A protein has these predicted regions:
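Residue-level signal for secondary-structure boundary sites
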Residues: 14-16, 60-62, 100
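Short, flexible segments with low predicted structural confidence
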Residues: 1-2, 17, 33-34
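An amphipathic, aromatic/His-enriched active-site/gating alpha helix that lines ligand/cofactor pockets
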Residues: 24-36, 55-91
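Glycine-rich beta-strand-turn "strand-cap" elements at beta-sheet edges
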Residues: 2, 36-48, 76-101
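Short, surface-exposed ligand-recognition loops at beta-strand->loop->(often short) alpha-helix junctions
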Residues: 9-20
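Short, well-ordered beta-strand segments in beta-rich or mixed alpha/beta enzyme
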Residues: 3-8, 38-68
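Intrinsically disordered, low-complexity segments enriched in polar/charged residues with Gly/Pro
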Residues: 14-15, 25-28, 40-42
Length: 101
């Protein structure tokens, strides 16, 4: 199992746009992508700080998913939303899942 933690900062006042982004990302997902779970979370002390945790079967499946042409059109729309609401580029942290319960 493999995961990626994505951390971003929202532009001021853009918290209400997160459900729109989540819906767009959910819409582009393919049933055979290897995705096990996605979570979108806001920092309780700093709601402008957002974390997305994506858990996949393996890093190999994650890299295949990144290149899947079936997702491209929908991802363009998601990237447009991100450009509107994020203050800068996301920070990516790749994680090996040691235990899951």
């Amino acid at each position: 199992m493999w995961a990626q933690l994505i951390t971003v900062r929202l532009k001021p006042g853009r918290e209400a746009d997160l459900p729109r982004l989540a819906a767009q990302l959910r819409a582009v997902e393919q049933p055979d992508s290897g995705l096990l779970r996605s979570m979108l979370m806001q920092d309780q002390q700093d709601p402008g700080r957002v974390h997305m945790l994506v858990v996949l079967e393996s890093e190999e499946k994650a890299r295949e998913r990144e290149q899947d042409p079936r997702r491209e059109e929908g991802l363009q729309a998601a990237r447009a939303i991100m450009a509107e609401i994020f203050e800068g580029p996301p920070e990516f942290t790749d994680l090996t899942v040691s235990e899951d319960w």
